[in-house]
């Protein structure tokens, strides 16, 4: 039985595989004979996470449960078809009431190869007193801001920019308060927060950073999947 003192997690996996050219949910696409979902859940557990709630497409819940049958203390619930933000809120509700200081992580199944050390760093930072923590990488490309017409309007200093990954970690009370404050945005993907740290920022919270990892790539397009398969084959 899980303890309230254990870190818990919401693993978002309700996305489609359309940009990968797949008819199945993206989280069920396989790497080395196992779905992305399984790899992501295994990585969370290895990093020190206890209970995990997975948000899945309503039509695929049984497939998801079957894919995770060899991982304990994990449950699958229906996610939202409106936004990731709303899916996370449903996952938090499924975790039930938690102590205010409980550490809760939010991770994307689309980042199946996140090293356990990244998860552990996030947990350690929250345990050390941070209310919200995100793993980040330096930006290597030059970035531009553009107008709706496509004209360049500015060049931000690259040294001030980072690329954000998951899992993101929070004190339970901080994340719940942030989701409650931003709940009205979740009904529309165009308005919804693209990550949970953004909701914390919106209520005036401080978000801290830890080092991410290049292996925590997000599988979105076919090239991402090809690279992830090479990395997974090397791990298997």
Feature locations, PLM:
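Residue-level signal for inorganic ion chemistry
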Residues: 11, 37, 91, 107-108, ...
